């Protein structure tokens, strides 16, 4: 049997190159090899389990899945709590115009989620190569549409954002909140942080829920089952580079024309 092409990110037990000087041909191969392999029916359960075992073996000795979950959600919940406390201490009442921040931030966050997923997690680009390697060449190799659930809690590391990444998002958005507080109102600044942190926690918990066993209490929830179907379609390697990039609510998939077509559509 001919040897199938494989993503650089998983070949020979490696988790991926992060060399920013890789040529265009190498990048293109990374982005297409998994699709080619899956189409050729080479993405077997044994093949995926080998990547799963390798990724778990690479976990540092200090890694604990529940500590990871507590850290990522804890940062978001901490910012959320600080925002609520900050708002309660403001002397002025909340104005109706301040509330416009909530839908505005939610809309931008949904777009940001869609754009990062499409253009960073599925396209190798400097300086985000490691994010591509962890997502396309690992997460998508382990979890496919017909086999989404985690096998063990140690696999949280394959699904959750690193705690440092969540902290980085908070630090990156803080200047925007300060700008709103200065140019609009202090309430608007706090509402920005509140909405952004709530969205971030929702992203983490929803993504983890999609990869929970379907017969679990979480997996059986109707809303989770509905949203999981959208995300699971994205885990078909043949279409993962083109469709269903939203993880929370597929608003920008709908707006940008990246909703996966129905299966009976040619």
Language model features by range: what are they?
Residues 111-266:
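Membrane-embedded catalytic scaffold of the fatty acid hydroxylase/desaturase
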Residues 1-66, 264-265:
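Transit-peptide-like, low-complexity N-terminal presequences
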Residues 2, 9-26, 81-126:
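Membrane-anchoring/interfacial helices and their immediately flanking loops
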Residues 30-37, 96, 186-189, 208-210:
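Short low-complexity stretches enriched in small and charged residues
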Residues 19, 23, 30, 42, ...:
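Acidic-enriched, low-complexity/disordered segments with a strong bias for Aspartate over Glutamate
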Residues 58-113, 165-194:
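Long, highly hydrophobic alpha-helical transmembrane signal-anchor segments
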Residues 12-17, 23, 27, 34, ...:
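A generic signature of intrinsically disordered, low-complexity regions enriched in glycine/proline
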Residues 5-7, 17-20, 42, 60, ...:
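Proline-rich intrinsically disordered, low-complexity coils
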């Amino acid at each position: 049997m001919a040897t199938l092409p494989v993503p650089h990110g998983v070949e020979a037990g490696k988790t991926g190159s992060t060399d920013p000087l890789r040529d265009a041909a190498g990048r293109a191969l990374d982005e297409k090899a998994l699709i080619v392999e899956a189409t050729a029916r080479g993405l077997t359960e044994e093949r995926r389990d080998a990547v799963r075992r390798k990724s778990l073996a690479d976990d540092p000795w200090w890694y604990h899945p529940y500590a990871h979950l507590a850290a990522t959600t804890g940062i978001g919940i901490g910012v959320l709590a600080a925002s609520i406390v900050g708002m309660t201490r403001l002397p002025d009442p909340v104005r109706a115009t301040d509330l416009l921040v909530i839908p505005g931030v939610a809309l931008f966050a949904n777009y940001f989620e869609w754009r990062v997923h499409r253009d960073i997690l599925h396209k190798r680009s400097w300086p985000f190569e490691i994010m591509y390697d962890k997502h396309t060449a690992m997460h998508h190799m382990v979890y496919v549409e017909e086999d989404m659930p985690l096998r063990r809690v140690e696999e949280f590391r394959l699904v959750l954002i690193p705690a440092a990444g969540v902290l980085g998002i908070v630090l990156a958005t803080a200047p925007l909140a300060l700008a709103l507080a200065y140019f609009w109102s202090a309430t608007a600044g706090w509402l920005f942080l509140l909405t952004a942190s709530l969205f971030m926690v929702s992203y983490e918990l929803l993504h983890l829920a999609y990869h929970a066993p379907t017969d679990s209490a979480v997996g059986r929830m109707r809303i989770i089952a509905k949203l999981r179907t959208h995300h699971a379609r994205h885990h078909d390697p043949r279409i993962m580079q083109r469709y269903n990039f939203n993880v929370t609510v597929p608003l920008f998939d709908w707006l940008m024309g990246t909703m996966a077509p129905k299966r009976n559509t040619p």
